[in-house]
């Protein structure tokens, strides 16, 4: 009987230090990418003195596909989007219905809205075929962190990419995960991403018409840093990273937030922003995209999940 696959931890997790400035940015490679070659391109860029002095590699591990499946890491990571893909039409909030009507110019009641899994059956497509189904850019809408694609005859599919994401993560695909601690803000970090993207294109590992997220993911905001960290950072085969290990969580703790509050932000990110007389529905991940820790925390002060 073969032993269970466990993470290969090359650089153990360095716990967060609330007295040390900087933020966590987690990077992990897509399972369909060529991991070894992609890592080579990535570390070649990072070895440049321009970036090396501003980044600290605080974790590096390889997560076996079998381990990812066993712990349902992908399902937990995409839990909110997975819920919308499963429930389809019934998952839409009133604000989301209005946004769809405004963007596509069709009454919500007249639209045939399918969750991604229902669409696979009705349209008789594979997960990859649904994901790759081309439509013009004006037929794709992001609402509250959910992706809606309009097909023919006013058929709409919500989170059409989720089945393919789940399918690509299987026992034979390993994922390399890195944590970088950096004093760079997101404006300063973006040129690094562009340099990596350019090098991937030069190495024929990325289609110039596609975004870098086809090859790798990086945390795009403080709350996504927490989501990525709790899902993909493992101290051992049995112990995940905790909130105490992550810089933004330490920052929130210092502001008086409890673990329970923080975890609720991650599991129920859609809420209402109270701005005077206005009540604006927001997804906290989208709302704090590329924010500093201070900016993201301030936005939570008027954010309510009871609506």
Language-model-derived ranges and their functions:
Residues 1-307:
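Non-catalytic terminal and connector segments of soluble metabolic enzymes
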């Amino acid at each position: 009987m073969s032993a269970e696959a466990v993470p290969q931890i090359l650089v153990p997790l360095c716990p967060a230090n609330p007295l040390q400035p900087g933020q966590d940015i987690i990077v992990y490679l897509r399972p369909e990418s060529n991991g070894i070659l992609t890592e080579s391109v990535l570390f070649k860029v990072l070895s440049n003195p321009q970036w090396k002095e501003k980044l600290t590699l605080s974790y590096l591990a390889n997560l076996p596909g079998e381990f990812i499946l066993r712990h349902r890491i992908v399902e937990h990571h995409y839990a909110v989007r997975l819920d919308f893909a499963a429930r389809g039409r019934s998952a839409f909030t009133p604000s989301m219905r209005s946004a769809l009507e405004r963007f596509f110019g069709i009454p919500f009641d007249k639209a045939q809205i399918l969750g991604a899994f229902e669409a696979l059956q009705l349209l008789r497509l594979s997960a990859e075929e649904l994901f790759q189904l081309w439509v013009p850019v004006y037929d794709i809408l992001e609402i509250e962190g959910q992706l809606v694609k309009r097909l023919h005859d006013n058929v709409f599919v919500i989170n059409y990419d989720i089945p393919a994401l789940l399918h690509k993560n299987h026992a034979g695909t390993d994922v390399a995960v890195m944590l970088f601690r950096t004093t760079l803000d997101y404006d300063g970090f973006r040129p690094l991403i562009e340099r990596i993207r350019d090098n991937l294109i030069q190495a024929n590992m990325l289609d110039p018409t596609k975004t870098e997220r086809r090859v790798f993911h990086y945390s795009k905001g403080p709350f996504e840093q927490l989501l990525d960290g709790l899902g993909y950072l493992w101290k051992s085969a049995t112990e995940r990273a905790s909130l105490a290990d992550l810089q933004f969580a330490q920052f929130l703790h210092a502001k008086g937030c409890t673990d329970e509050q923080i975890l609720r932000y991650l599991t129920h990110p859609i809420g209402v922003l109270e701005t005077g007389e206005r009540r604006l529905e927001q997804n906290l991940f989208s709302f704090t995209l590329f924010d500093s820790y201070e900016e993201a925390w301030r936005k939570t002060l008027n954010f309510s999940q009871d609506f």
